[in-house]
A protein has these predicted regions:
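Short pre-catalytic strand/loop immediately N-terminal to key active-site residues, enriched for Gly-Thr
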Residues: 12-18, 202-216
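Conserved N-terminal subdomain of the carbohydrate kinase-like
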Residues: 2-11, 31-111, 115-118
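N-terminal basic/disordered segments at the start of proteins
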Residues: 19-35
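Short, small-residue alpha-helix embedded
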Residues: 151-152, 212-236
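Conserved phosphate/ATP/ADP-binding segment of small-molecule kinases
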Residues: 126-202
Length: 285
């Protein structure tokens, strides 16, 4: 039994049939970190470690219905938003988020502005980027773009960590949200992420690069971990630090599955089975 209320995280994202990213990665991450995961699915994808092969969008009205069903019964302490697809989906989600945050102003909203799958398939229509900027991003507390996504959102090129700092500050000013700009696309032995919080304080997080092709779902996992830590009361800079560590360990313990970009291992914080669960069953006469 839980001794205190469990943090509730609603993930609004696409379903990954391979289980490495999207809703599946979100559920694994949130559960591993001790929170409760609920979902609103925006699209079904036919994918594996070799790439995304097909996408079936969920009708916007049905996405809204999923969100309302969760919020009106289970509730949420944080909402993580991932794959969106098209403008009508963005507008539908934004409409629901406005209603939810008006009733619950302390709700954390973390948006991972997913645009491309690792294989290069578009997960957000180019013509929808303007809608994303105008309708949804201003509703976020934290936005977690990688470098290509930040370039699309800002219209500027990023080639250095100094560029990252400038663009993160620019995106903060244009959205009002804290920006965690992920630097994994820059070359080098170190990976640097930049955080600009809502007080315009700048933080730099650096760690040695892990040489691995088992990195499918890192963005989804990071955003879900961040949303979970925030819902659990961790302050933003510390939540970023903890979320980055969780993703790093999930990469290091990747199960080596698939012939392409393999999934992470999310079950890091699950304790080993209790002794009575590993004993053989009692044989009854």
């Amino acid at each position: 039994m839980f001794s205190k209320p469990i943090a509730r995280i609603l993930s609004i994202a696409g379903s990954d049939s391979g289980g490495g990213a999207g809703i599946q990665a979100d559920i694994k991450t949130i559960t591993s970190l001790g929170a409760y995961a609920s979902t609103a699915i925006t699209a079904l994808t036919d994918q594996n470690t070799l790439g995304v092969h097909n996408i079936l969008p969920v009708p916007p009205d049905f996405i809204r219905a999923q969100i309302r069903s969760v919020i009106n019964d289970i509730g949420a302490d944080a909402i993580k938003i991932g794959m969106l697809g098209k403008s009508d989906t963005i507008i539908a989600i934004a409409t629901e988020i406005k209603q939810v945050t008006n009733r619950h102003p302390y709700l954390h909203v973390v948006i991972d502005p997913v645009m491309l799958a690792k294989g290069g398939i578009a997960l957000l229509a180019k013509e929808s980027i303007t809608t994303l900027r105008s309708d949804l991003l201003p509703l976020a507390n934290v936005i977690t773009p990688n470098i290509p996504e930040a370039e699309q959102l800002s219209g500027k090129t990023i080639t250095t960590v100094s560029d990252m700092c400038a663009i993160a500050s620019y995106l903060h000013k244009t959205t009002g949200a804290a920006i965690l700009l992920k630097g994994g696309h820059l070359s080098g032995d170190q990976v640097t992420d930049i955080l600009v919080d809502t007080n315009e304080e700048l933080y730099r997080f650096t760690a040695p690069r892990i040489q691995s092709h088992h990195t499918h779902g890192t963005g989804c996992t990071l955003a879900s971990a961040l949303a979970t830590y925030l819902a659990q009361g961790v302050k933003l800079p510390d939540a970023v630090k903890q979320a980055r560590l969780y993703v790093r360990n999930a990469i290091l313990h990747a199960p080596q599955l698939g012939a392409g970009s393999g999934p992470l291992w999310h079950a890091l914080s699950i304790p080993p089975p209790l002794p009575y669960l590993t004993e053989p069953p009692e044989k009854l006469k």
